Amino acid sequence: MILSVSVHEDLHALAVQHAVRRRGREFHIVESDGIGGRRALSWRSDGAFGSATVMTADGARVALEEARVLWWRRPRADQTVAAGATSAHERSLVNNDCRGALGGILAASFHGQWISPADATDRAADKVYQLAVARDAGFRVPRTLVSQSRDEVVAFTREVGRTIVKPVVGARGPSLWTRRIDSPETFPASSFEVCPATYQEYIEGRRHIRLNCFGEQMYAALIETHELDWRPDLDVPIRPWRVPHTLHRQVTTVLRRLGLRMGIIDLKLTPQGEPVWLEVNPQGQFLFLEPLTGEPLTEHFADFLTSAEEAEEGEEVPSADSERRDDLDAVTGTTGTGR
């Protein structure tokens, strides 16, 4: 059995579910935003078979002991039904406890393959950390400054020349696109002090690479545009791009060091053809590329999951009293709950 933890009506999860089920495999979606308001979770400490169950989007109750692969796609959404909660504190309690219970139960009772492990996913989502890992693996990375100081930003732009600015993490809601920053000395110092931002040297060129990594398999698209951020306008030349062996090896090294089984990577090619690392999204979007490139990424990803399931079925499933996974906090993601 393959499980996907995601949000209600997530197009990626639904498309992959359809592809996997066509292969005669069992695939269920557990809606991380649909725990509140129904009997969605159950766990007992005695470890008997069936002592850990989750309710799927179809309303079925499945035992985690039967699952072999867990696609950790969108695990930490707020609840769509707050189960009668009215105040902000009550809603926070519902969201935290639903999130914590789901993550904790999975960490304690799921013994198959994570796509990708929760702690690795969290760590790899740190853009500063992943830049350091990519650099150590031999990638060229943009010269980068994370700062709240106008003076530091001014000095940095004078050192590197053309500079872009983007969020360190970002927020839910409208996207904040990458932008040029010119003459930072003309902005008030207080505008820099509100929160840290990421400042990077501008990489010359118009060839962007979107690299979809599913296990050892990689499928790339070449996006040609002069825009800093290609995402707002996809009405540009986009086509499949063959991944060179050297790049494949470097990317594999980065993903292994990050502990990721999959990743969606953004690169930019210099005018000389050198790939420059921009970032990896541990659970990035890929469906939009199918109609633009003709690459059947849904089928490729379904093959990746079913191969992982077959590999797990060939191994002995650990007993219930085997060593529990480390760092449950990385999985539960609870905040401000106390002890």
Pin down the residues of each PLM region:
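Conserved N-proximal alpha/beta basic substrate-recognition cap immediately N-terminal to
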Residues: 7-22, 28-140
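Phosphate-binding site of ATP-dependent enzymes
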Residues: 20, 158-250
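Short acidic-glycine loop/turn motifs at beta-strand connectors
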Residues: 45-48, 57-58, 213-217, 271-273
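Loop-centered beta-sheet repeat module
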Residues: 123-176
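A long amphipathic alpha-helix within ATP-dependent nucleotide-binding catalytic cores
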Residues: 193-196, 201, 229-275, 298-310, ...
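A short beta-strand motif that forms the metal-chelation/ATP-contact edge
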Residues: 211-213, 273-288
